[in-house]
Amino acid sequence: MDFEQLLDKSLNKVREEIKTELSKSLDEAIKLLNEGHTKIIQEYTQRINELITKTKEEIEGEKARLEVENKRTLLVEKEYWINKVYERVLEKIGEVVKTKEYKDAIQSILNKEIKEMEGEKITVYCSPNDKSTVEKVVGNNKNVTIKTDDKMLGGIRIYYEGSGLTRDFSLKLILDQVFDSMRGKISDMLFGGK
């Protein structure tokens, strides 16, 4: 073997060693890149999932807030229309107080209360429109004082001076009580339900 062959052989051997080392280094670099890539993918996947979860929670919170706001708005709107019905009923009281049944009811209540008072002094409050009806029932009874109340829409309110007791048969009070007890039914009629 001559020198050149020996040199070639040595160079080839060194080349092979370098090539093997480079191949190992390349494989190691690729392995490190793949591991880094996988780690980065996992890390960002976790961050993305956390952001998605947080966003979902925010959306659910906003959705719940909007549902509450919508319910509140609906309740306000329902209350508005129920109050409109109440106002219309109040407007109709003027027609009710003109009926014979109304006047008969006032007379019946007064007759019963005057009988039960047994000489106690009373003051009967009524609307100016009902004064003549009340005067007819009271007649010359000295224990009864009649006073008009411009705020009363109809009906009577009786104050017993001896006991300090007041019995209220005013149409407004009766209407309020009936309306409150029927509020659910009125809501169902207006907006559907049950």
Swiss-Prot record:
Coiled-coil regions, chain positions: none
Entry-linked InterPro entries: ATPase_E_C (IPR038495), ATPase_V1_Esu (IPR002842)
Subcellular locations according to the entry: Cell membrane
Gene Ontology MF terms in the entry: ATP binding; proton-transporting ATP synthase activity, rotational mechanism; proton-transporting ATPase activity, rotational mechanism
Primary residence: membrane
Lipid bilayer topology: Peripheral membrane protein
UniProt keyword annotations, A-Z: ATP synthesis, Cell membrane, Hydrogen ion transport, Ion transport, Membrane, Transport
Example of a GO biological process term: proton motive force-driven plasma membrane ATP synthesis
UniProt keyword annotation of Transmembrane helix present: no
Cellular component, GO annotation: plasma membrane; proton-transporting two-sector ATPase complex, catalytic domain
Record's keyword annotation contains Membrane: yes
Record text on subunit structure and interactions: Has multiple subunits with at least A(3), B(3), C, D, E, F, H, I and proteolipid K(x).
Protein task: Component of the A-type ATP synthase that produces ATP from ADP in the presence of a proton gradient across the membrane.
UniProt record similarity statement: Belongs to the V-ATPase E subunit family.
Protein name as annotated: A-type ATP synthase subunit E
Gene: atpE
